[in-house]
Amino acid sequence: MPAPHGGVLQDLVARDASKRDSLLSESQQLSQWTLTARQICDIELILNGGFSPLTGFLAQEDYNGVVHNSRLSDGTLWTMPITLDVPEQFANSVKPNQRIALLQDGTIPVAILTVKDIYKPDKSVEAEKVFRGDPEHPAINYLFNTAGDYYIGGALDAIQLPQHYDYPGLRKTPAQLRLEFQSRQWDRVVAFQTRNPMHRAHRELTVRAARETNAKVLIHPVVGLTKPGDIDHHTRVRVYQEIIKRYPNGIAFLSLLPLAMRMGGDREAVWHAIIRKNYGASHFIVGRDHAGPGSNSKGVDFYGPYDAQELVESYKNELDIDVVPFRMVTYLPDEDRYAPIDEIDTSKTRTLNISGTELRKRLRDGGEIPEWFSYPEVVKILRESNPPRPKQGFALVFNDDIKVDRDQLSIALLSTFLQFGGGRHYKIYDHNDKPEFLELISDFVQAGSGLIIPSTWSASNKVNSANVYTIGHAKDADIKLASTEETIFHIVQKVVLFLEDNHFIQF
């Protein structure tokens, strides 16, 4: 088992356990900062040692070293800036050497930060050096549109880890996981990083990796922040709990990682390797386009397919963790088995595969997902969380250019929908622009209802749902009406056809 990065596991909770009560009391008297969702993930991995050798949020000297050279000020390899970003108003309220209580959800103190410095980073440099500068990169979008303009650096005193109310038995800290491996006498462990559900191909490639390296398997999925649009972690964890049963007995272990991904490609892959070393893994599977967010709106990839593997491999000796390249496997239907695609002559051997896009389409449309691709229990979980279109909800928002009587159009649509039956709940919901209303719309849609919103709704694009559609004459309307379609009958007909084409209604 490798030593932690930097030589010592920085388990701050264990280090500060004897003074926890005094720290808790002190925190009530200090200025307070409520941590953001990303900061909650970061501080948990600082406090539990997952980010060893870090013992706090980066001060300016360390930050500059990481951004420009992928190294802390003492020369230690570290590729991702871990910063406490705050708005200018809060930054102006604190001074060096001041102590600040850091809270979860505004009420739960998790640590006290001793301020070393407050600085305003050059975000354009961070964006270019760390994430290659494309403004469409999700981390750059976060940097400029969500993160505070000032960073506060300093060391932490641990009060407690952030609280989680789900899967307590699966949330192992680095110290706990290392003890688990020792108790099982696992000195060689290959870690598998994922933010997606796992299917048969993933099981096959991880088993192959274990056999090739004479190691056991750590399934170590991210359950913090991942790429926008990813499947929620509750669905994924249920999948992992089922697929772990499909591994040869005693070969695999499941533990959850509370990481906030940046989708930082090659730099993030090195960061992931460091984290897995801290958790006790001796080997790490690095995938094709590892931790990459795909491509931008012009179809240009943010990272090359092998950038991550090459950068991690270049630091192999310094990382003290062996890189296992992700070998794509494909299904051979004539032999009913999976094999690495680089070993197959596809001109002579028949292969089958289902892409992520095709899988999402089959889930959406209720299409068949064969057992050679995924286990039945996994498919069942995915279908429960991703019902086909006829069982999904939707909301229809009237634009302000509709000229017919809105109340009558609402009644006509409701009456038309109700005659289809099918178990979907339909409701007319007049609007206001309060945030609570936006949340309610999203809840109704996710619960499978059909909503009709007759009043003009300028904030419709703020609803956190993919199935909210506008009706009107404007070019950007989802259901666009021609100038001649001014009767309620014509509009209802157009709406019904739209819903049928998108599989919400089946005849």
From Swiss-Prot:
Coiled-coil regions listed in the entry: none
Pathway as given in its UniProt record: Sulfur metabolism; hydrogen sulfide biosynthesis; sulfite from sulfate: step 1/3
Marked site (Transition state stabilizer) residue numbers: H199, H202
Positions bound to ATP: Q193, T194, R195, N196, G287, R288, D289, H290, V329
Top-level enzyme category: transferase
Ranges for region Catalytic: 166-391
Family annotation (Gene3D superfamilies): HUPs, P-loop containing nucleotide triphosphate hydrolases, Sulfate adenylyltransferase
Molecular function terms, GO-annotated: ATP binding; sulfate adenylyltransferase (ATP) activity
Swiss-Prot/TrEMBL site (Induces change in substrate recognition on ATP binding) positions: F326
Lipid metabolism is among the record's keywords: no
Catalytic activity: sulfate + ATP + H(+) = adenosine 5'-phosphosulfate + diphosphate
Stretch list, region N-terminal: 1-165
Record-stated family: Belongs to the sulfate adenylyltransferase family.
Free-text note on domains in this protein's UniProt record: The oligomerization domain is distantly related to APS kinases, but it is not functional and does not bind APS. It is required for oligomerization of the enzyme, although the oligomerization state has no effect on the catalytic activity of the enzyme.
Subunit description: Homohexamer. Dimer of trimers.
Name of the protein: Sulfate adenylyltransferase
